[in-house]
């Protein structure tokens, strides 16, 4: 008795599984078939049928039921097909009219767009014409620089504008030489100011400004023969492109260079390892590691 009661659930479950499986299979097969039956097949019109429909459409875009039935009998198609054809034909006609209107507007718009690039080109040409003279002037400035100047590229900007200006560094104001040669040597010495950490020594050299007023003026303590000898030696040293005291325009055998003035007594010792500034009022030392 218990075994009989236990069997029906399994049998029922088995049947339920099979029936549920069949229910799952049948809808997947049966439901898509019904929309296919409801979907209308695409009607293909022949050339003769289209000619008759176009002739009626030329007469009126909205034919009544009687006209549609008459045409349906002629072309051997149901009246509903004729009605749908007229509906689609009217939509196509409206679309063509919109395209024509948009095409007319697009024809006008490109003319405006064509004129605007010409204006842009003219404006670009005008700007290029305005900026072309600075480019041409920058060429001689670079060509006028000497070969040693290319070694000291960071200092090639400020000395070109005015090598003996009061706003330049103390090394440029204090070195005795003519204006033509100062353009090259001031550029070579400008990078050595990096040892000073960007400090301006203009306050220590204020009495020296009046001596560099003329283009060919030199410092009073230095004689012209000494200047020319130092220049000749410094040119040979700069051509060798050696880094040290010789590349900075000093004699290769000399260890220090002293400048003395009556108005302001100060001493400048230039070595490869250290740099000393001495003054009567304040004495300080800056050593480069």
Curated annotation (Swiss-Prot):
Coiled-coil annotated spans: none
Origin superkingdom: Eukaryota
GO cellular component: nucleus
Protein name as it appears in the record: Homeobox protein OTX2-B
Skewed-composition ranges (Low complexity): 95-106
Family as reported in the entry's similarity comment: Belongs to the paired homeobox family. Bicoid subfamily.
Region spans: Disordered: 93-140
Molecular function in Gene Ontology: DNA-binding transcription factor activity, RNA polymerase II-specific; RNA polymerase II cis-regulatory region sequence-specific DNA binding
Function noted in UniProt: May play a central role in the initial events of axis formation and in particular in specifying anterior head regions and their spatial relationship with trunk structures. Activates the head organizer gene cer1 by acting synergistically with siamois and mix-A/mix.1 through the 5'-TAATCT-3' element of the cer1 promoter. Also binds as a complex with lhx1/lim1 and ldb1 to the gsc promoter to stimulate expression.
Skewed-composition ranges (Polar residues): 123-140
Organism: Xenopus laevis
Keyword line: Developmental protein, DNA-binding, Homeobox, Nucleus
TM region(s), chain numbering: none
PANTHER family hit by this protein: HOMEOBOX PROTEIN, HOMEOBOX PROTEIN OTX2
Biological process according to GO: regulation of transcription by RNA polymerase II
InterPro entries in UniProt: HD, Homeobox_CS, Homeodomain-like_sf, Otx2_TF, Otx_TF, Otx_TF_C
DNA-binding span(s): 38-97
Keyword DNA-binding carried by entry: yes
Positions marked as site (Determines DNA-binding specificity): 87
Location(s), subcellular: Nucleus
